[in-house]
């Protein structure tokens, strides 16, 4: 008798990394909504979506962790720029 899980079920580690990626994506899109110029806002939304789509098929854990770190840095940079623009 085999496992009850479907063959494509994620391991706990994969699930946690996926949640981290989705959380980062949501944070980026929330920050982008704070951009005052509508054209810049659309550009940044498309850029973020394309970056995540382009890397959707990544499976190597080290590469995914590096991409998460890179995304977090870019989010911090965006938040810093937005904070400076408001000042």
Curated annotation (Swiss-Prot):
Transit peptide extent on chain: 1-19
Any GO CC annotation of this UniProt entry: mitochondrion
The keyword Hydrolase belongs to this UniProt entry's keyword annotation: no
Presence of the UniProt keyword Transit peptide in the record: yes
Compartments, record wording: Mitochondrion
GO biological process: mitochondrial respiratory chain complex I assembly
Entries under CDD domains matching the protein: Complex1_LYR_LYRM2 (cd20262)
InterPro entries in the record: Complex1_LYR_dom, Complex1_LYR_LYRM2
Keywords: Mitochondrion, Transit peptide
Chief localization: mitochondrion
Stored PANTHER family: LYR MOTIF-CONTAINING PROTEIN 2 (PTHR13675:SF0)
Family: Belongs to the complex I LYR family.
Function noted in UniProt: Involved in efficient integration of the N-module into mitochondrial respiratory chain complex I.
Designated name of the protein: LYR motif-containing protein 2
């Amino acid at each position: 008798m085999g496992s009850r899980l479907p063959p494509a079920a994620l391991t706990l580690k994969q699930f946690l990394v996926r949640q981290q990626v989705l959380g980062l994506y949501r944070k980026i899109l929330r920050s982008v909504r704070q951009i005052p110029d509508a054209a810049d806002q659309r550009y940044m939304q498309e850029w973020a979506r394309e970056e995540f789509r382009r890397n959707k098929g990544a499976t190597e854990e080290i590469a995914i962790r590096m991409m998460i770190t890179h995304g977090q840095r870019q989010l911090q940079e965006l938040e810093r720029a937005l904070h400076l623009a408001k000042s």
